[in-house]
């Protein structure tokens, strides 16, 4: 097993996750089996109870793990399925050690950070690195580990010490440290400054880790003189200084790394049985990055949500839309609309914001209402859903978005004016959306219906069924505590709103579709968590196809989005023969 530790310096949020994912992608393109681990040095057990404004979206794994959004990057880049134990937190480690102490496993010893916490970290990493993640039963060969935060943070000290010890346990030829640092550029002079990187590397060395590669993040390409200066003062060869500047798309990052001979370096440094360059997989990434930059036609989608001030709150939704837009050769223009801005109260308090929000909604080719919690902003979401339904605008509702679509239809089409969710009105006269009793204990953490679940199609005449490849059932990831009341669905199906997908027992409503509408679909699950750059999510793909006027032609062509499909490379903008560009990982 080979271990690649990715650390960061100067500031957080400079792209360690993307760089770690890109490194894994390059090594996978060389024919190696790759897994990934993210370490978050916070005391929370997992990310399940975080506000989206704290760390961005909560990403959900197949096994129901609620984890950091970086694991979503790993899954998308590497096309793998990780587990909740691939996300290590300080809380998990301390809980694990304290439980062992309570059982008496330490035989009365004084339990300390060193060696007990550090040993637990090393043991966890070694055990989890062996777990297959690509659908095969073969053990991974490479484990990419990202240490969250920045070097010098007090929260991360036990983990840094753990890896200081681990580098000797694993042996030099099996352990490599990549340090990601910021090279700021002064706006007044345009000069790129190396001092922050020098200090960061010095701090890392002072803690016992020496970087094998220094990845320099900058707004513009780094000059050779700057690269040589970093090489000299940080005591590494020039080829060990990798420069990653801001690019138009993250698809370009693996290509930038590969162009700087990173494969050759890993081959020599870790004694890998590979060639000096990446294979056909990376060629597809290069082609995808090139195509992304050549796109001309634009598709505008309005995302109506309550967490729009921080884009990371909807990271997977954005990626799923981007994957689908790229697949049909369109550039995505995603317009974030705070749902409160669509409400009447905003018209009174801030008319300018109200009219700007409605102008965005009216200009959109398609409307998306994603998942969320709480009553704030729900009236605005209902307004957006009503607009999409009545004006025949393609619409996709996810989780809460689907529940609100059902409520909107009940109020405006079935005259059930008191229809509501018990999440918002516990004593609603018409409880259209109800809580699931088995998922309603006292604690909030990990108490929802989580992880991958099977959804069975009730009818063959379903748009989503066709988009999924005309299969009888699908498996997607869930994260919800409320569901549509199954006792009230008959009225809907008599009025063109069909519940075309249900769980295996037929008790839970999973998919809705509205007849006589270009695309009005709601799903209880979160398909964005399963979307991949080369295998876009069918519900999101359907939204983009409908928004560009190509859905009917695509369905008539009989295209299927199964793992065995081979799609032709369509770099032009024509869609005369509906098809998906060649995006699939082989």
Curated annotation (Swiss-Prot):
Disulfide bonds: none annotated. Residues 563-586 are annotated as: Disordered. This is CTP synthase 2. One of its GO terms (cellular component) is cytoophidium. Pfam families: CTP_synth_N, GATase. One of its GO terms (molecular function) is identical protein binding. PROSITE patterns: GATASE_TYPE_1. SUPFAM superfamilies: Class I glutamine amidotransferase-like, P-loop containing nucleoside triphosphate hydrolases. The keyword Ligase applies. Residues 300-554 form the Glutamine amidotransferase type-1 domain. The modification Phosphoserine is found at residues 568, 571, 574. It catalyses: UTP + L-glutamine + ATP + H2O = CTP + L-glutamate + ADP + phosphate + 2 H(+). Belongs to the CTP synthase family. Catalyzes the ATP-dependent amination of UTP to CTP with either L-glutamine or ammonia as the source of nitrogen. Constitutes the rate-limiting enzyme in the synthesis of cytosine nucleotides. Its EC number is 6.3.4.2. The active site is at 399 (for gatase activity), 526 (for gatase activity), 528 (for gatase activity). InterPro entries: Class_I_gatase-like (IPR029062), CTP_synthase (IPR004468), CTP_synthase_N (IPR017456), GATASE (IPR017926), GATase1_CTP_Synthase (IPR033828), P-loop_NTPase (IPR027417). Pathway: Pyrimidine metabolism; CTP biosynthesis via de novo pathway; CTP from UDP: step 2/2. GO terms for biological process: 'de novo' CTP biosynthetic process; CTP biosynthetic process; pyrimidine nucleobase biosynthetic process; pyrimidine nucleotide metabolic process. It comes from the Eukaryota. Keywords: ATP-binding, Glutamine amidotransferase, Ligase, Nucleotide-binding, Phosphoprotein, Pyrimidine biosynthesis. NCBIfam families: PRK05380.1, PyrG.
